[in-house]
């Protein structure tokens, strides 16, 4: 009440915001071979800010690291998710090398070999570390590393010329 005997009242609504429960789930394995990807999905709010700068609810990850997201709900309250570790495994170095000329006459051959890896799948069906092609064709190898990752080598073209008749 003031000096004139007047009084006033004000209604105030207090909103007690509750922090959202920020969670991250992976849409696949978080350890994968080079060239792979995993989608990380955020939940618990209406807006999202990932530690890599993305502002979408879901992110597609191809690089290793720890990923977390700040989630904000409709009341403007925020919370940070736990970190999700993404590991990217190195693919083997897949190089096929010809040890000799790749163009030769019928009856000849050339050794094509690779190194590294633990298993090999050549385009001609061989599973050895090296092959000795005697027919024309394009040869490459899929190498599997100790970590299970694969890589395809360069292609080597072999040309076998017929022996001329007299």
Language model: regions and residue ranges:
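Proline- and Ser/Thr-rich low-complexity, intrinsically disordered segments
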Residues: 1-166
């Amino acid at each position: 009440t003031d000096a004139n005997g007047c009084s006033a009242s004000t209604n105030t609504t207090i909103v007690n915001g509750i922090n959202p429960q920020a969670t991250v789930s992976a849409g696949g394995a978080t350890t994968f071979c080079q060239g792979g990807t995993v989608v990380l999905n955020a939940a618990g709010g209406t807006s999202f800010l990932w530690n890599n700068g993305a502002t979408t609810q879901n992110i597609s990850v191809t690089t290793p690291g720890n990923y977390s997201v700040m989630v904000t709900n409709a009341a403007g309250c925020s919370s940070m998710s736990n970190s999700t570790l993404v590991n990217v495994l190195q693919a083997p170095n897949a190089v096929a090398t010809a040890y000799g000329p790749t163009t030769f006459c019928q009856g000849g051959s050339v050794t094509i070999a690779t190194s590294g890896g633990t298993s090999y799948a050549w385009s001609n069906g061989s599973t050895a570390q090296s092959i000795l092609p005697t027919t024309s064709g394009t040869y490459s190898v899929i190498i599997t590393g100790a970590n299970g990752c694969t890589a395809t080598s360069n292609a080597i073209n072999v040309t076998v010329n017929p022996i001329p008749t007299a």
